[in-house]
Amino acid sequence: MAISFRTLALLTLSVLLISISLGVVTATESQRNEGEVLTMYEQWLVENGKNYNGLGEKERRFKIFKDNLKRIEEHNSDPNRSYERGLNKFSDLTADEFQASYLGGKMEKKSLSDVAERYQYKEGDVLPDEVDWRERGAVVPRVKRQGECGSCWAFAATGAVEGINQITTGELVSLSEQELIDCDRGNDNFGCAGGGAVWAFEFIKENGGIVSDEVYGYTGEDTAACKAIEMKTTRVVTINGHEVVPVNDEMSLKKAVAYQPISVMISAANMSDYKSGVYKGACSNLWGDHNVLIVGYGTSSDEGDYWLIRNSWGPEWGEGGYLRLQRNFHEPTGKCAVAVAPVYPIKSNSSSHLLSPSVFKLVVLFVFQLISLALL
């Protein structure tokens, strides 16, 4: 039976009105009133141990908190999002305040002159589909906190050294970031004012090693008063130097991570409220501002390929202190510039834990031949 024009028009109008009504309800429900937000804020203050003493400071921070909450909820309402944002200890900070206190990565192009072919990806290389150095015992379980100090470079450096030391010796030792902050002043590292993992590796080599954080604990303060001379006999970990992964090449970076944790710089200014998922959000793909440690990679069935990154903002941030960042990006620099400045420490026999791809292929062929002969 044919539908009249009048009937069709009424049906269309009804659907439109229902859609508008649903939209109004959804919008109303998503908009919190001032009292609800204030209750959330008071609870957040308790959970994060915040206490403001300055006149009007609590009110000023509340306004910032509201703005950040709005940004979080607007992002999380997008059905096509690849990651979640959430409230955390940074939720009362402006973007400028966050960047000034928690970023600190510095890297001059001259420091990338030590590019090595050790992890240059070659056609035919066989690499694992996924890697997680936490499962192999090469990552200190406790996610560390840099605090309000731009010392991310020190944490990325110690994490990489902790990893290669465990891979080479079988011993996992948590190392001292504070020694680097206090004592590594000869290059372009400036304590809480920022620095780079490359120069930290140089310092550790030239200094004859680095002590554990049990001996030289972290304070997060930029005193420049080096206490390491008193601990000369307690050095526990040494390295032979450092090298740079071929830059702007995610396949070479993947190969490097298959061998050991790698220190990189990423553009992290927009990641203060990252909570979970594979980050595909806004960032610079040209140059980084924050040092972190890649400890693995993998593929999510929902969000695709990712890098597994250990941060130094404590376990309350992100996925227990970790970030999953989009991998196999369409630009050679990688997502958020992850492939621009990848560096790693080297230690005697540091490559002995994993067969080279070419040798691995020969071993696989040999095993298959043995199996074939056994079945004859």
Curated annotation (Swiss-Prot):
Q: Which InterPro entries match?
A: Papain-like_cys_pep_sf, Pept_asp_AS, Pept_cys_AS, Peptidase_C1A, Peptidase_C1A_C, Peptidase_C1A_papain-like, Prot_inhib_I29
User: Which domain of life, per UniProt?
Assistant: Eukaryota
One GO MF term attached to the UniProt entry = cysteine-type peptidase activity
Q: Please give the residues making up the propeptide in this record.
A: 28-126
Q: Where is the active site?
A: 152, 290, 311
The entry's note on the tissues where this protein occurs is:
Expressed in root hairs.
Kindly name one Pfam family recorded for this protein.
Inhibitor_I29
Keywords associated with the record: Disulfide bond, Glycoprotein, Hydrolase, Protease, Signal, Thiol protease, Zymogen
* Disulphide bonds in the chain: 149-192, 183-226, 283-336
Catalytic EC class: hydrolase
Q: Which residues are glycosylated?
A: 80, 270, 349
Q: Which PROSITE patterns match?
A: THIOL_PROTEASE_ASN, THIOL_PROTEASE_CYS
What happens in the null mutant?
Decreased root hair length under phosphate deficiency.
Any signal peptide, and if so, which residues?
1-27
EC number from the UniProt entry: 3.4.22.-
Which Gene Ontology BP annotations are present? Answer: proteolysis; root hair elongation
Annotated PANTHER family = CYSTEINE PROTEASE FAMILY C1-RELATED
State the family it belongs to: Belongs to the peptidase C1 family.
Q: What does this protein do?
A: Probable thiol protease.
Protein's recorded name? Probable cysteine protease RDL3
Q: What species is this protein from?
A: Arabidopsis thaliana (Mouse-ear cress)
Q: Which gene encodes it?
A: RDL3
